[in-house]
Amino acid sequence: MANRNLSPHHMFWQMALEHKPLHSFDGGDFASWQKETLPKVMATLGDFPDRVPLNPELMVEWEHDGVKKQRWMIDVGKFISASLIVSMPPDLKPGEKRPTILAWHGHGQYGKDSVMGNDSSPERRAEIDRLNYNYGHQMAKAGFVTFAIDWMGIGERCDSHKPHFKGHAGGRDWCNLYYLHATMFGMTSISINVTHGMAATDFVCTLPFVDPDRLGVMGLSGGGTMTLWSALCDERMKAAEIICYSDLWEVFGMRDTNYCGMQVAPGLYKLVDLPDLQGLFAPKPLLVDIGVYDTCFNVDTAMECYRKVEKIYAAADASDKLELDLFPREHAWGGNKSRDFFGKYL
């Protein structure tokens, strides 16, 4: 009998092994490649939801570890709101405007709360310590205004959490379920989340201590996904830090199935691989964090991704705008270059 395969997973991986994305950067003219590729990549995201008035409401102000914080509620869509945490540097003076960083969270129970420094329980402290996760809080202490919202399916916007608990997910990942819903409407989770992030950015730019001309974005893991898409979709972003979200879809996606509906769009891999997506941000400044001991995105293929991004930035005559923080930890924020990087470019 011929050698047969009954595993769909093996089928997809073998497809990936022989696949070359149609618009993978081949070393040609960068400007022509970017001009042709970026609109096609954006089209894979589908429709973006309509924008609505923000109707901001300040819920509470407090101070934590010297950092003044605010919790706001804003409307980010016709049928959906988001809670927003804003952190201000301890040395912020009246009338002063500061560079501002969008601090995007990744997967995890607590969403934006950990990134913005909520260490109010042993479980929350453990997550922050394990991932060096409170970069929104740390960057505020370093002199930047920072802010964050929850993405769909995580933190306060997860339907498994009170007070809006829904048990019908049956243990399935809400990221995948929301993606299925979104595609039925011709959208994607990325297009919806990006729109919600842009709404939050619109609001924060109205605050008197925010300089709207000096915006950056950073995020770990799934937050790295959203950092990348925010950077590509929102021209206001002057610099970006992608933390532990470098790899090849052939490996972390098709082989390891280490992705979800929050990270994908129909036909995206037909067009580009992850290093191509990162390279499309050129020539703007990009800092990439890679953990040597990362068991989520293996250092071997993470570095292969980074070397491809290096070639794209070189073709864009922007090698000096690409930086690497290679650090000896697990899946986490390196945090060794972030302050200087954003201090230089914002």
Q: Where do the language-model regions lie?
A:
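Proline/glycine-enriched tight loop/beta-turn segments at coil->beta junctions
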Residues: 79-82, 90-100, 110
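N-terminal targeting or regulatory segments adjacent to alpha/beta-hydrolase or S9 domains
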Residues: 1-68, 76
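Mobile cap/lid helix-loop segments that gate and shape the active-site cleft of serine hydrolases
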Residues: 176-187, 199-200, 237-278, 283, ...
